[in-house]
């Protein structure tokens, strides 16, 4: 008899579980070596508390909601950054920064599972609280690359962008306020066909529309930062400063990705994603969220990242198959 499980979820059997355990222990070892203490938060949070994060991005993953016996509205956490922001404000109100936390936890998102998106995700990551840019961002990228190296992943690259870049360009060419959210939503999905359509609908002059379509498609070394217009100056300077602080073995993993827009609405500056040729989707990502802690009563700059353990496992298996077939990086 077949007893189904909800779409977007899966069982993990012993052989795969052993492999995933090796991955998570490798990640934990690097996090611990860099001074990140592991925390765990409830899977259930009060909706009213997490609403302080003011996540209004149209591409924000939807959450599961339910009522408890007293009628209070609860949500299943969709990531760990917002719960850790709550922890910092409530449990570490006077602790001097920087504060370093890591985690291994399940998160839940009320997505349309028929699109292949998981409803339950196992994530590992860090949050660095109280360390401003560019130094804090460089530390997070360093820990990220060393953690991936520890798992044995070889072919990955880290795309580095800035959440303020595209909004600054839109403001610079005076995109109508009512059109900006639609453009950002298309860019977050990497849907350049939809981006081009939305730019046409916004009624921009051809040159300005071409600028907003071409800049997000720039990806590569420092040369892609050249020739950007004045409104992009702050974002470009920030990305350059972060890159200059990286050790050579980390810097060689980083590429500039000017179309990078993370779907979570709290990012304010540098953002990054992990790519690997063995997987057709990002393995993980993160960025700066310098305004989030202030919404919980403790204004501190912050940066962090999360890695999807399932996707990391698939990428490692794909690289192993590639080596077995005689493929090289």
Where are these regions (language model features)?
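Hydrophobic mid-domain F-helix/FG-region of cytochrome P450s
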Residues: 143-150, 164-174
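Short, solvent-exposed helix-helix connector turns and helix-capping sites enriched
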Residues: 162, 190-191, 220
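TRNA-binding/sensing appendages of the translation machinery
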Residues: 1-82, 138
């Amino acid at each position: 008899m077949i007893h189904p499980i909800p779409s977007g979820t899966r069982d993990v059997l012993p052989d795969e579980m052993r492999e995933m355990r090796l991955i998570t222990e490798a990640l934990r070892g690097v996090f611990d070596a860099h001074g990140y203490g592991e925390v765990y938060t409830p899977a259930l949070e009060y909706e009213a508390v997490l609403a302080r994060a003011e996540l209004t991005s149209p591409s924000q993953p939807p959450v599961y909601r339910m009522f408890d016996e007293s009628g209070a509205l609860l949500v299943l956490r969709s990531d760990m950054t917002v719960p850790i922001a709550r922890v910092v404000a409530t449990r570490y109100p006077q602790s001097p920064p920087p504060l370093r936390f890591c985690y291994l936890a399940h998160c839940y998102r009320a997505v349309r599972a028929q699109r292949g998106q998981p409803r339950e995700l196992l994530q590992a990551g860090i949050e660095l609280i109280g360390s401003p840019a560019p130094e804090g961002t460089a530390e997070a990228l360093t820990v990220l690359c060393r953690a991936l190296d520890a798992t044995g992943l070889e072919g990955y690259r880290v795309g580095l962008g800035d959440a303020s870049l595209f909004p600054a360009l839109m403001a610079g060419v005076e995109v109508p306020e009512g059109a900006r959210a639609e453009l950002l939503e298309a860019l977050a999905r990497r849907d350049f066909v939809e981006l081009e359509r939305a730019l046409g609908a916004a009624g921009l002059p051809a040159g300005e529309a071409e600028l907003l379509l071409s800049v997000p498609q720039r990806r590569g070394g420092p040369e892609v930062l050249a020739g950007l217009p004045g409104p992009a100056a702050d974002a470009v300077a920030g990305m350059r400063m972060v890159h200059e602080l990286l050790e050579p073995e980390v810097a060689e993993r980083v590429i500039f990705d000017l179309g990078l827009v993370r779907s979570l609405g709290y990012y304010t500056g540098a953002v990054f994603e992990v790519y690997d040729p063995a997987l057709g989707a990002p393995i993980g990502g993160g960025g700066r969220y310098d305004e989030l802690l202030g919404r919980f009563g403790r204004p501190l700059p912050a940066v962090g990242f999360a890695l999807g353990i399932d996707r990391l496992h698939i990428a490692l298996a794909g690289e192993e198959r590639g080596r077995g077939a005689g493929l090289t990086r």
